[in-house]
């Protein structure tokens, strides 16, 4: 029995030596290589599965976003009466904006719409400002979200080089994005102020010399009041806050009721007129100061 074991062991040793000399794989080597081959084949499969899952997830997210964005607030002026240009109040259609008023005005305002709001819905407010002597330009945003084109004001300002001084502003999300634009341009001497409607700044403007006016409706239930109060110290020194009694969030535009908003006790036209008056008073007071007189 012992002899058989010895012969068996010797045979295995001989086979191993022969395999090494002839470069033939042993059964153990073959198994290892087989496992490595299987593992190598599995890696691309796992990568394909992961990429496919990621692609599906991105498609679902994109579909959800487009469904959300398409449920937007449309301009109630179906016949575009507010876009009619007259000799006393010219209206110019740009590639992605509507400009109301004198293209050579002393002061211009570039306005960013609120989230999911059709930009032409702010035409009545822009006309009110134009009637007070401003060039008021409302910008069309990609998918109606201002965060997709924060620097839209650059193109508008380039199209109207004869305007004396520029302000930027916006409604709701548009106001917050306008504030970010103001931060980015506060130090280059090309921007004079910020207008916020139903909005607040998440960017620190406290150390700038910009003018700033913030307006909101007393019945606004969309605006985050806590954020409005907490972020007030981010505005420049001398910023003014105006509460429009009876106004709400949607009343700054002409797009109808907004989900979650309070009911206004004044008409949108009244709210827009009061808004234009307050902006006009504030801006004129800013330029009445000796240090700002040369800007307008």
Report residues per predicted region:
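Hydrophobic membrane-insertion alpha-helices, especially the h-region
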Residues: 49-66
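A conserved short beta-strand
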Residues: 189-199
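Conserved alpha/beta-hydrolase
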Residues: 126-146
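Short beta-strand element of the alpha/beta-hydrolase
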Residues: 106-114
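C-terminal catalytic-base region of ester-bond hydrolases, centering on the histidine
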Residues: 231-296
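Short alpha-helix in the alpha/beta-hydrolase fold that links the catalytic acid
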Residues: 125, 223-233
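Gly/Ala-rich beta-loop-alpha elbow adjacent to hydrolase catalytic centers
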Residues: 170-178
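Short beta-strand/loop motif that positions the catalytic acidic residue
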Residues: 214-216
